[in-house]
Amino acid sequence: MAELQEVQITEEKPLLPGQTPEAAKTHSVETPYGSVTFTVYGTPKPKRPAILTYHDVGLNYKSCFQPLFQFEDMQEIIQNFVRVHVDAPGMEEGAPVFPLGYQYPSLDQLADMIPCVLQYLNFSTIIGVGVGAGAYILARYALNHPDTVEGLVLINIDPNAKRWMDWAAHKLTGLTSSIPEMILGHLFSQEELSGNSELIQKYRNIITHAPNLDNIELYWNSYNNRRDLNFERGGDITLKCPVMLVVGDQAPHEDAVVECNSKLDPTQTSFLKMADSGGQPQLTQPGKLTEAFKYFLQGMGYMASSCMTRLSRSRTASLTSAASVDGNRSRSRTLSQSSESGTLSSGPPGHTMEVSC
């Protein structure tokens, strides 16, 4: 029987009432593919990368990441890093609708805008955090500029181009569903949509009544026309930095993330499969994701052990080693809930980890 190790799960605590939000500075910069808007929080820290985020289709940086970065325990992280939130063109608040016939950038071109952002800010390296389309964009950027990326947190990434069967299903769905409903099906699981929780109602309202819905459709079309990233384990096309892959259990992109995990270097990759988190774990489980992010950063040498003391709270989990059922995947470890207490030592990624929490 595999030896059990235990790790405590942080209790979920939103930003405390009355806690002053960070000051933000919003900038726009011209690139070869049009203007891009980004918002900077904090000040650069010596010898530390910036945390750069990129949001999914139907969202902007606030609706995608605010619940995560305003979470109380996340403050330990953001005090130590400057943060750059990139909005895809036309997705920023108050963005004008693009004129009819506007050629929206491809996802590859959106990735090629990032060097302009970093040059404008005079930042040399980043830790990228992306969701869905944003995860793809950051992965593409990391392939093109590996020396500038120290780590990646990729939530719901699908590294594959749409295949003809996917296209047929997409076209058929488009005949019977509106753009907002198709995007909601991309963001959330069918179980979540059927449950119609307050979260689903909120995001359905945000997308359905978005004044820039035409722009959102352009971003959606670019995502559906993405190229294959062609990851190959042991090949030349791979991510060179530490990577944490994240997906919710039974989320729309679960299979794609599992496949992506099988193609990346197991010595550099951690795989976090989050139970009870639905399609958007950064919205539904910010506490668990914050904790995982802290361990990821600690493994990279950026979060000292003294910064991790607040992790020892309330709920606990057990870490057990298990062999993968997929021959293409490496030996994995699974994190499951337990009633006993303990700690998990952190270090650089040593092999692929499959984590359910």
Curated annotation (Swiss-Prot):
Modified residue annotations for Phosphothreonine: T20, T316, T320, T334, T343
Pfam families to which the protein is assigned, alphabetical: Ndr
GO cellular component: a single term: perinuclear region of cytoplasm
The organism's place on the tree of life at top rank: Eukaryota
Biased composition (Low complexity): 333-347
Job of this protein: Contributes to the regulation of the Wnt signaling pathway. Down-regulates CTNNB1-mediated transcriptional activation of target genes, such as CCND1, and may thereby act as tumor suppressor. May be involved in dendritic cell and neuron differentiation.
Designated gene of the protein: NDRG2
GO BP annotations listed: cell differentiation; nervous system development; signal transduction; Wnt signaling pathway
Modified residues (Phosphoserine): S312, S314, S318, S321, S324, S330, S336, S338, S339, S341, S356
Disordered: annotated span: 1-28, 320-357
The protein's name: Protein NDRG2
Protein keywords: Acetylation, Cell projection, Cytoplasm, Developmental protein, Differentiation, Neurogenesis, Phosphoprotein, Tumor suppressor, Wnt signaling pathway
Lineage: Eukaryota, Metazoa, Chordata, Craniata, Vertebrata
UniProt organism field: Pan troglodytes (Chimpanzee)
Subunit structure: Interacts with CTNNB1.
Subcellular location, record wording: Cytoplasm; Cytoplasm, Perinuclear region; Cell projection, Growth cone
Modification sites for N-acetylalanine: A2
Protein family: Belongs to the NDRG family.
